Structures are given as structure tokens and as C-alpha cells.
Regions:
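Positively charged n-region of N-terminal signal peptides that target proteins for export
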Residues: 1-6
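Bacterial N-terminal signal peptides
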Residues: 8-22
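Low-complexity, acidic/polar, glycine-enriched regions of mature
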Residues: 24-194
Length: 194
């Protein structure tokens, strides 16, 4: 009986130890609060061969990331598509319309990643998904990131096909007018919140 009690007690200690370590490990990736004035989410499209840069002025991000805790890192960015700004009122109105983002029906674009690959001390790939205009596709997002104390800086870019997301219909399907590939860019600076 005493032997059985010792076995049960030992197993209980082991289980609680694993739970404690697991929880501590899962909480190790710090959360980051964005410095909005130093962060930017944008894109570069091509119209008749000329590059057209733009930014999204409103977005929210939930970022838990650390190079030494990639298995516990995750990113979710929600972008208000209505906030697009290409420095042209007429063009922005067109981009918001049903022909492109259809912001009335699809007010958010969402990037989410929970799997990360480290290529070098400061180079990574986020394996995630991008949702635009109600269409979700897998995407690999290469980026560089550095953590110094309670400061995070990251930047990266990736190309996506606008046609995969149904962006640009009717006359805008012509890739000689609007290029098929759009380069998504971002610069993020954040401060640790825990």
C-alpha cells in the first residue's frame, strides 16, 4: 500500500512538473505593443509598368515573438482595407470599390502565422495565411527581426497574386494594365508588454 502511494505521488509530481514547465515555456515568447508612428504596412503594385506604392493607415497587430521561442510565437495582423492610401483620392476610391477590395463587404485583410523558420540569427520565414476579399491562401513571409532588451524591430516583404484573391475584376483583369503580382511590405517596431 505504501509502495502504491509512492508511485501515485511520484506520477502526480511528474505530471504537475510537466504542466508547470509547459506553461512557463508557452509564456516565454513576449508580447509586443506596436509603436504606430514607427511602424508601417504597405504595398507596391504596378500600373502600366509604373510602380504605385500605398499604405494602410489603420491596422491592429497581436504579436508574440522571440527568436529563441519560435515554437511559442504567433502573429495576427488585421488591416482596415478602407484605410488604403496611395496619395490619389480617385485611385483610392477605385481600390475600395467592388472592383478591387470591396471594402464594404470585406473591411479587413488578415495575416496570421503560428509557424516560424529561422534562416540565420536575424532572418526568418513566417508560414501563415493571408485573407483578403474573403479568400484565404497560405503564404510564406520572409522577414528580418531583432530583439534588443524590450525593443523589437522587424521588416519584410512578400509577393502575392492579386488574382488569387479576386482583386481586380472586369477590365482590371488585364495584367498589362494592373500587374498581377503585388509586393506587400511592412516595418514594425514594438515594445514588450510583459
Amino acid at each position: 500500500m505504501r509502495f502504491l502511494f509512492r508511485v501515485i505521488f511520484s506520477v502526480a509530481l511528474l505530471v504537475f512538473g510537466i504542466m508547470f514547465l509547459g506553461r512557463s515555456h508557452a509564456e516565454a515568447a513576449p508580447l509586443w505593443s506596436l509603436k504606430n508612428d514607427q511602424s508601417k504596412v504597405g504595398f507596391v503594385a504596378k500600373q502600366s509598368g509604373a510602380e504605385i506604392p500605398g499604405v494602410f493607415e489603420q491596422y491592429q497587430a497581436e504579436i508574440a515573438f522571440h527568436p529563441q521561442e519560435l515554437s511559442n510565437s504567433h502573429i495576427r495582423v488585421e488591416i482596415a482595407t478602407e484605410s488604403v492610401n496611395t496619395q490619389s483620392g480617385d485611385r483610392d476610391k477605385l481600390i475600395r470599390s467592388n472592383a478591387f477590395f470591396d471594402t464594404a463587404a470585406h473591411p479587413k485583410a488578415i495575416f496570421e502565422a503560428t509557424t516560424f523558420e529561422q534562416l540565420s540569427p536575424d532572418s526568418f520565414i513566417a508560414h501563415g495565411s493571408l485573407t483578403m476579399r474573403g479568400v484565404t491562401k497560405e503564404i510564406d513571409l520572409p522577414f528580418q527581426a531583432s530583439v534588443e532588451g524590450d525593443e523589437l524591430r522587424a521588416q519584410g516583404e512578400a509577393e502575392v497574386s492579386r488574382l488569387d484573391y479576386g482583386i481586380g475584376n472586369g477590365q482590371w483583369l488585364d495584367t498589362a494594365v494592373i500587374g498581377e503580382m503585388v509586393r506587400i511590405t511592412f516595418v514594425i517596431e514594438g515594445v514588450a508588454t510583459k
